[in-house]
Amino acid sequence: MQDLAKTKINIKSPAKINLHLEVIGKREDGFHELAMIMQNIDLSDYLEFEINNEGLIKLESDCNDLSLSDDNLIVKSANLLRKKSNIDYGANIFLRKNIPIGAGLAGGSSNSAATLIGLNKLWDLNLGQEALCSLASTLGSDIPFFINGGIQLCFGRGEVLEKLDSNFEYGVILLKNPNVSVSTAETYKKYSNRFCHQYLTDREMIENIRKNLRENGLNNLNLDNQHLSIKNDLQLVVENENDSVKQALYLLSKLENCLTFSMSGSGPTCFALFKDIETAKKELTANYKLFRNKGYDSWVCTFLEKGITFI
C-alpha cells in the first residue's frame, strides 16, 4: 500500500495579464458581463502539497502579508475540494510567494486553481478539467482561466473560456508600486457609476462583441500590426484616480522599444510589451534605477503557452 503521508507534489502557479478587458454590461447575478483575453506570464508562485492523515488543511507561507486562515483562497479551495470529494485526508500546503498581492495579476486566483489541480492529483481524485472548472467558478470569476491556462478568450463574468492558438514571444516589463493596491470591487463599482449608460443588454449585440474579439483579438496583438494596442476599460477609472498608475504608464510609454503598454486587470500593475525577452531585459537593465527611484518594483518575463504546471 502506498505511504500517502510521504507523498508530495510541487506546482508552479503563474500570474496573468489582460491583453483585452472590455466591460459590456451588468448581469442579473450582479457581476459584470466581460469580454477579455487573458495570458499567463512566467512570474510565478510555487506551492508544495503533502498529504496529512489528520483531515486538516494547514497552510504556511514565506509571505507575512497573507492570512493563512480559512479566508485564504488556497484554504477555501482545499476545503471545497475535500468536501465535494468526501475524503478523510487533509493536506499540508506551503506557498512560496513571488506574485505581488493586490496587483491585478490574479496571484490568489492562480493559487486557488493550483490547489484544485494539485490536490486532485495528491488525493488521487481523478476529476476532469470540466469538473475542476465547475468548482473553480464557485470560488472566483477568473479561477477557471487558470485551470485551463495559456492564452484564452474569457466571456461571461470571466468563467466562459475559449482557447486561443498563438505563439506570441513577447517580452514583458511589469511595474508596480509596492505601497499601492487597488480594490477590484471598488473599481468595478466606480466604472459602473460612470459608464452604466453605455451598458448593453441585448444578447445579439453582446454576441457581436464576442464574435469580433474571436475574429480580431489576436490580430490586434500581432507584431505585424502597426497599431498594436491593448484595451482595458478599467484603466479609464484607475488611471485618473491613481497617480502611481498614471506615472507607471507614462514611464512605460517612454521606453525606446515599447510596442504597447497597459494596466493589467483592475491594477495597479502596468506592463509594456517588447518584441522578445532579450529586448525587454535590455530595457529593464537600462531603466531599473529610474523605476526604483520612482518607487516601483519591476520584473521582466515572457508569455507562457501553458498555465499551472507540475514541477
UniProtKB/Swiss-Prot annotation:
Keywords in alphabetical order, please: ATP-binding, Isoprene biosynthesis, Kinase, Nucleotide-binding, Transferase
Q: In which pathway does it act?
A: Isoprenoid biosynthesis; isopentenyl diphosphate biosynthesis via DXP pathway; isopentenyl diphosphate from 1-deoxy-D-xylulose 5-phosphate: step 3/6
Q: What class of enzyme is it?
A: transferase
Annotated disulfide bonds: none
Q: Which GO terms describe its molecular function?
A: 4-(cytidine 5'-diphospho)-2-C-methyl-D-erythritol kinase activity; ATP binding
Signal: is it a keyword of this entry?
no
**Where is ATP bound in this sequence?**
100-110
| EC number assigned by the record | 2.7.1.148
Biological process terms from the Gene Ontology for this record are: isopentenyl diphosphate biosynthetic process, methylerythritol 4-phosphate pathway; terpenoid biosynthetic process
Indicate the residues that form the catalytic site: 16, 142
- A Pfam family for this UniProt protein? GHMP_kinases_N
Reaction catalysed?
A: 4-CDP-2-C-methyl-D-erythritol + ATP = 4-CDP-2-C-methyl-D-erythritol 2-phosphate + ADP + H(+)
Describe the task this protein carries out: Catalyzes the phosphorylation of the position 2 hydroxy group of 4-diphosphocytidyl-2C-methyl-D-erythritol.
Family per similarity comment: Belongs to the GHMP kinase family. IspE subfamily.
Record's protein name? 4-diphosphocytidyl-2-C-methyl-D-erythritol kinase
Q: From which organism does this entry originate? A: Prochlorococcus marinus (strain MIT 9312)
The organism's taxonomic lineage, starting at the top: Bacteria, Bacillati, Cyanobacteriota, Cyanophyceae, Synechococcales
